[in-house]
Curated annotation (Swiss-Prot):
Region (Disordered), start-end ranges: 161-307
Record protein name field: Cell growth-regulating nucleolar protein
PANTHER family, per database record: CELL GROWTH-REGULATING NUCLEOLAR PROTEIN, CELL GROWTH-REGULATING NUCLEOLAR PROTEIN LYAR
Keyword Phosphoprotein belongs to the record: yes
Acidic residues biased stretches: 229-239
Cross-link (Glycyl lysine isopeptide (Lys-Gly) (interchain with G-Cter in SUMO2)): 14, 207
Mapped zinc finger ranges (C2HC LYAR-type): 1-26, 28-52
Tissues where the protein occurs: Predominantly expressed in testis.
UniProt keyword terms in alphabetical order: Cell projection, Coiled coil, Cytoplasm, DNA-binding, Immunity, Innate immunity, Isopeptide bond, Metal-binding, Nucleus, Phosphoprotein, Repeat, Repressor, rRNA processing, Transcription, Transcription regulation, Ubl conjugation, Zinc, Zinc-finger
Residues recorded with modification Phosphoserine: 215, 244
SUPFAM superfamilies found in the cross-reference section: beta-beta-alpha zinc fingers
Species classification: Eukaryota, Metazoa, Chordata, Craniata, Vertebrata
Length: 379
């Protein structure tokens, strides 16, 4: 976008706003460009479409600015607009619009963007006029490439000396040349894709080769193992060629046998320890059994027979030993069950069944009295 300064009032104005500023500032006769400093009298500012950049301004004498592709296309587009204004078959409304468009340096080159730009910048909302303007542009753009092709064609057909030489060249060389030309024409992306595909193919081929080699190496090993197994089953000795493999298999078997023997020994030791621990526990429990009162004869209830358990007698004996013939249910239960396990050889009943029997014996027997969490012996 080009900016000007008014020489009369000194205000900076955009190129689009110059006409509005002239109607306000009556003494405005000359405008000077802010970037390049040139003076423009009257309507000469309309031809000043583009100015130098800051790099060109402050770059020095030897500076050469880079030409951008977009700028070249934009300049060609604006030139096309100025050529369309000179056409005789253009309506006056469209011509006025084209003159306004030529003052801008950022005219879009696609239909949708061009029409939106016309609506926003030039305030033209009539779609028929917009379509007319765009049709003129499209006709001009389509006619240009045809003219260029006609100019590029030679007037007289010139004999091609390479054609005669190519007929003598063999077909293989011609194919190579065509392939080389095709490779040159390809983009960087296509080349990259081809390289990646080649790498993938090479990797797949290497994997297949490695897999085949591994399978070949594994097959003879399996056969050797099968032969050894057959020979061992038949009672024959393994040949000297396969002696190392046979020794390994024998060593493995010996190790397995020794490991199984050790496990058996360890298991037997553990069982012995458990049995000894059980015996010591039973002895301790027998020591804790209630003793007979001094000078008195033992009661029939307190001497249970081996194998059967006397619930009533054991409970009575434990309560007699307790102070005031009274003990908590928890302690009583613990002592009674301990006595039960020592007396009975085989534990056929579960702990839940034993607890049910214990509760029945306490609650239903009149000699025992329950006081909250305690049991008392009634004399």
């Amino acid at each position: 976008m080009v900016f000007f300064t008014c020489n009369a009032c000194g205000e900076s104005v955009k190129k689009i706003q110059v006409e509005k500023h002239v109607s306000v500032c009556r003494n405005c006769e000359c405008l000077s460009c802010i970037d390049c400093g040139k003076d423009f009298w009257g309507d000469d500012y309309k031809n000043h479409v583009k100015c130098i950049s800051e790099d060109q301004k402050y770059g020095g004498k030897g500076y050469e600015g880079k030409t951008h592709k977009g700028d070249i296309k934009q300049q060609a587009w604006i030139q096309k607009i100025s050529e369309l204004i000179k056409r005789p078959n253009v309506s006056p409304k469209v011509r006025e619009l084209l003159e306004q468009i030529s003052a801008f340096d950022n005219v879009p080159r696609k239909k949708a963007k061009f029409q939106n730009w016309m609506k926003n910048s030039l305030k033209v909302h009539n779609e028929s006029i917009l379509d007319q303007v765009w049709n003129i542009f499209s006709e001009a753009s389509n006619s240009e490439p045809v003219n260029k092709e006609q100019d590029q064609r030679p007037l007289h057909p010139v004999a091609n000396p390479h054609a005669e030489i190519s007929t003598k060249v063999p077909a293989s060389k011609v194919k190579d040349a065509v392939e080389q030309q095709g490779e040159v024409k390809k983009n960087k992306r296509e080349r990259k894709e081809e390289r990646q595909k080649k790498r993938k193919r090479e990797k797949k081929e290497l994997k297949l080769e490695n897999h085949q080699e591994n399978s070949r190496n594994q097959k003879p090993k399996k056969r050797k193992k099968g032969q050894e197994a057959d020979l061992e089953a038949g009672g024959e000795e393994v040949p000297e060629a396969n002696g190392s493999a046979g020794k390994r298999s024998k060593k493995k078997k010996q190790r397995k046998d020794s490991a199984s023997e050790e496990e058996a020994r360890v298991g037997a030791g553990k069982r012995k320890r458990r049995h000894s621990e059980v015996e010591t526990d039973s002895k301790k429990k027998k020591m804790k059994l209630p003793e007979h009162p001094e000078g008195g004869e033992p009661e029939d209830d307190e001497a249970p027979a081996k194998g059967k358990f006397n619930w009533k007698g054991t409970i009575k004996a434990i309560l007699k030993q307790a102070p005031d013939n009274e003990i908590t249910i928890k302690k009583l239960r613990k002592k009674v069950l301990a006595q039960y396990y020592t007396v009975t050889d085989e534990h056929h009943r579960s702990e839940e069944e034993l607890l049910v029997i214990f509760n029945k014996k306490i609650s239903k027997n009149p000699t025992f009295k329950l006081l909250k969490d305690k049991v008392k012996l009634v004399k």
